[in-house]
Regions:
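Short glycine/serine/threonine-rich phosphate/pyrophosphate-binding segments
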Residues: 46-52
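Short acidic low-complexity segments
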Residues: 28-38
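Active-site catalytic pocket residues across diverse enzymes, especially alpha/beta-hydrolases
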Residues: 55-58
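Short, charged N-terminal beta->alpha structural module
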Residues: 1-29
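Catalytic core of DAGKc-family lipid kinases
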Residues: 12, 70-135
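N-terminal glycine-rich "phosphate-gripper" loop used for MgATP/nucleotide binding
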Residues: 41-45
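Proline-centered loop/turn at the N-terminus of a beta-strand
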Residues: 62-63
């Protein structure tokens, strides 16, 4: 018996991911993510990171298996519709331990958000930015 008897399937909006989603739905039966034991993510790194953030916000400890159908894909497995259940069973599990980033805007408003993979800082002006980073 599989460790993940109930799988959910999510795909990014891009056509390659949507095409792969249709292909997998013809082969396998999937459940809504709320009922799943694991989730298959079709897309790129950004899509997988969005999914991980969503799971963190919902406080769900749900394994995610990503297959690259996006632009980057460093965090993803190669796309292959064959033998999905066995690939999941053989996949090496990695636990993500996100850092919590507390951000204070110039208005004084503070935000605390999980930081997974990377943090990007963008400025709206050409003036020098003053940053304080505490780890």
């Amino acid at each position: 018996m599989s460790r993940f008897p109930k799988l959910a399937l999510l795909a990014s909006p891009g056509e390659p991911a949507r095409k792969a989603e249709r292909q997998l739905r013809e082969i396998h039966e999937f459940v809504p993510i709320e009922e799943a034991d694991a989730v298959i993510a079709l897309g790129g790194d950004g899509f997988l990171l969005q999914l991980l953030h969503r799971l963190l916000e919902q406080r769900r400890d749900l394994p995610a298996y990503g297959m690259n159908l996006g632009t980057i894909g460093f965090l993803m497995n190669n796309w292959n519709p064959d033998d999905l259940v066995n690939r999941l069973e053989r996949a090496k599990s990695i636990t993500v331990m996100p850092l919590m980033a507390t951000i204070e805007a110039t208005s004084g408003q503070r935000f605390t958000l999980p930081a997974i993979n990377e943090v990007s800082l963008l400025r709206e002006t050409r003036q020098a930015a003053k940053l304080q980073i505490d780890v």
